[in-house]
Structure formats: structure tokens, C-alpha cells
Amino acid sequence: MARNKIALIGSGMIGGTLAHLAGLKELGDIVLFDIADGIPQGKGLDIAQSSPVEGFDANLTGASDYSAIEGADVCIVTAGVPRKPGMSRDDLLGINLKVMEQVGAGIKKYAPNAFVICITNPLDAMVWALQKFSGLPANKVVGMAGVLDSSRFRLFLAKEFNVSVQDVTAFVLGGHGDTMVPLARYSTVGGIPLTDLVTMGWVTKERLEEIIQRTRDGGAEIVGLLKTGSAYYAPAASAIEMAESYLKDKKRVLPCAAHLTGQYGVKDMYVGVPTVIGAGGVERVIEIDLNKTEKEAFDKSVAAVAGLCEACINIAPALK
């Protein structure tokens, strides 16, 4: 049986980490692509040389021509410029929109049947533009954000309560940025909602709000520490979880930036919501009830994403 083919478009820190993780999980053969000739080839060879030690079978190749991604089952897009200290994700819009146009054309020509996961920032606007540039069905193009944001929230909660991360579930809605909406009411420790843990005296409302704010600032905190780039281990792990759910038809319930067609009162936009990912791509968008405060926060986040999409249209009118 032929192995799956995974194309990694962008071979920077996230791209290299994606290749290593995909190899370790034996998700398929891996092609690293980058316009910087030599980088994808070198990283591919380096990771391939780790396979006898780590005991995985996968062909890893690198290329600087889009024809190398031909027939890919999954494309994970990290191409673009990363954040530097003092920058918001939104500051990257103009540069990375042009990159998405090139990537979209490459996927359209060589991998029109792929499941596409976008990681490039500003995420919600870039995945929206990428879907339009590629012409792929909206359920086959998705943005990696919610899995990462929820993972950060879960870690901070586990540390606060001194429990295993495996026993913490967390929900983050909305855009992948300063207006994201971590939902305490739908987040649990051992099945107990955070709101109940406040009542039980495990944590104060004020401390919980501090953890929520740290989650919102999670990416910026790492950018500030690294000084020369942005996070890559956790984003790569998050995208691989999504790719695995698609390739193995696991039907995982994962929060991600999905195309909405009226759910949550949003049309023709990509916003972070809980989804079911299986062999059909995004097979279902799960609509949860939001109270007044949560709805206001979500609507504010949606408005921020809408503003970015409008900015994209001003740069590339063909997106309208």
C-alpha cells in the first residue's frame, strides 16, 4: 500500500519540526519545500539520517520547486515571515498575503485534493486568503490556532493546580490573536468545570483571569524570550495532531480556524471554533451556547478578524 504524502510548505523552524514529528509518527513520506534552495534539502537529509536511530520508516526529500508537492495528501503551510519582539501577528499581513498567493497557486496546480493546514500569521486572515487563492473546498482548508491556544491554556491550568496536563481540557474560541476567547465555563480539570473550581476555592476569579490573559499572550511571551523568532515546537505538534486526525479518520474534536457559513452568526470567514476532523476534512462545526459575556467577547474577536480580511481585500482585490 502506498504511503501518504505530506508536503510541508516552508522549511523554517516549524517546518523542520513538523518533518521530524511526521517521521516519528510514520504518517507518510515527507516533502519539505522552501524557496530558499538548500534549506529544505539539508533539513530533509538531516532528519532522514535520524530515522535509523529513532526507528521510523519514511522517505524525506527537500525541494524548491512546487512540482515536488504533486499529489500530496496533506499540505501544512508555514511559509512567511515570523514575528519579532514588539510585533503583533497583524503586522505581518502585507508580506505574508503575497506569500499565500504563491502558495495557493502551487497547491491549486499540484495538490488540489489535499487537506491543507495553514499556520502562517495573522492566521485567521491568511487561511481565509489561502482558501480563496487555492480554490480548494473550504472544508479541506483549515487554520491551526485553537489546538495550540488550548494547549497553552491546559498547560498553565495544570501548573496552577499541580495536576497532569492529561486531566485538563480547555476551550479557546475566536481569532488567533489578542482577542481570542479562552472559555473557563467549558474548560475542566478531571471533568470539573473551572467555574466550579472557583466555587470550591481551588482558584480565585482574579487568578483565573491572569491565566486566561497569559494564554492570550502565550505567543508573544515566547517571541519576547527568543528575540529572533517565534514558537515552533508546540505549533508543529498541534498541526500534526490535526493532520493525523485527517489521515487516520480519527474524527477528533479539535478547535481550529474553520470556514463558517452561518454558525455563530458568522458567514464566509475563518474563526476558531470546535470542529470534528476526519477523512472528509472538517466534517462538522460544533456550535456551543455562549452566554452574553462570552458572545460579546467572541463577536469582538470576529470583528478583529473581519478587519484583517478587509485589509487583505484592499491589498488583493481579487479576494473579494
Swiss-Prot record:
GO terms for biological process: lactate metabolic process; tricarboxylic acid cycle. Keywords: NAD, Oxidoreductase, Tricarboxylic acid cycle. Its EC number is 1.1.1.37. It holds the Pfam family Ldh_1_N. InterPro entries: L-lactate/malate_DH (IPR001557), Lactate/malate_DH_C (IPR022383), Lactate/malate_DH_N (IPR001236), Lactate_DH/Glyco_Ohase_4_C (IPR015955), Malate_DH_type3 (IPR011275), NAD(P)-bd_dom_sf (IPR036291). GO terms for molecular function: L-lactate dehydrogenase activity; L-malate dehydrogenase (NAD+) activity. Signal peptide: none annotated. The active site is at residue 176. CDD domains: LDH-like_MDH. It is an enzyme of class 1 (oxidoreductase). Substrate binds at residues 83, 89, 121, 152. NAD(+) binds at residues 10-15, 34, 96, 119-121. It catalyses: (S)-malate + NAD(+) = oxaloacetate + NADH + H(+). Catalyzes the reversible oxidation of malate to oxaloacetate. Belongs to the LDH/MDH superfamily. MDH type 3 family. This is Malate dehydrogenase. The gene is mdh.
